[in-house]
Design a protein with these regions (language model features):
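Conserved hydrophobic/aromatic beta-strand scaffold that supports enzyme active sites
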Residues: 5, 20, 36-38, 64, ...
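Ligand-binding loop in jelly-roll beta-barrel domains
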Residues: 32-34, 94-119
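Short histidine-centered beta-strand/loop micro-motifs
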Residues: 48-58, 76, 82-83
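Short, conserved beta-strand element in jelly-roll/cupin
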Residues: 57-74
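A generic structural motif
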Residues: 73-77, 99-101
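Short acidic-glycine-tyrosine-enriched beta hairpin
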Residues: 76-95
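Acidic/histidine-enriched, glycine/proline-rich intrinsically disordered or flexible terminal extensions
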Residues: 116-128
Length: 128
């Protein structure tokens, strides 16, 4: 789910502050501890080979985040693609790969246990 910042409802606007809120932006019920993550990614990075060996060869962890700069495209198990770019909020449900279309920096919030499993898997893949 991609939402441009401009499409997030303004709940309050006063001199010096604009408060935007998107409700019902995914469900974290039962996911336990959440980790805050900062990723800096170069154009061309593709997680497909790094996710080989995970269930469905995809990241099975949901993520909520914000794109500070750049552009990324996710592909799900059915082949559906979605592109997020600078100033977009996003929710990536379980079952995705990510390709970096333009140098990017993102902030994500993910279930700590599930995403640590994925990150450790990628570390092992890179080691060879």
């Amino acid at each position: 789910m991609r939402i441009a910042k401009e499409d997030v409802d303004v709940k309050m606007e006063i001199p010096g502050a604009v408060i935007r809120q998107r409700t019902d932006f995914g469900d974290a019920t039962g996911l336990g501890r959440i980790s805050g993550e900062c990723f800096t990614l170069s154009a061309g990075v593709d997680t497909t080979p790094l996710f080989q060996g995970l269930e469905g060869n995809l990241c099975q962890c949901p993520h909520w985040g914000f794109v500070l700069r750049g552009q990324l495209t996710t592909t799900d198990a059915e082949g559906t693609q979605e592109t997020v770019k600078a100033n977009d909020l996003f929710y990536w449900p379980p079952g995705h790969n990510v390709k970096v279309d333009a140098d990017a920096e993102i902030i994500m919030f993910s279930p700590q246990h599930e995403h640590s499993h994925v990150i450790n898997h990628m570390i092992e893949k890179v080691k060879g």
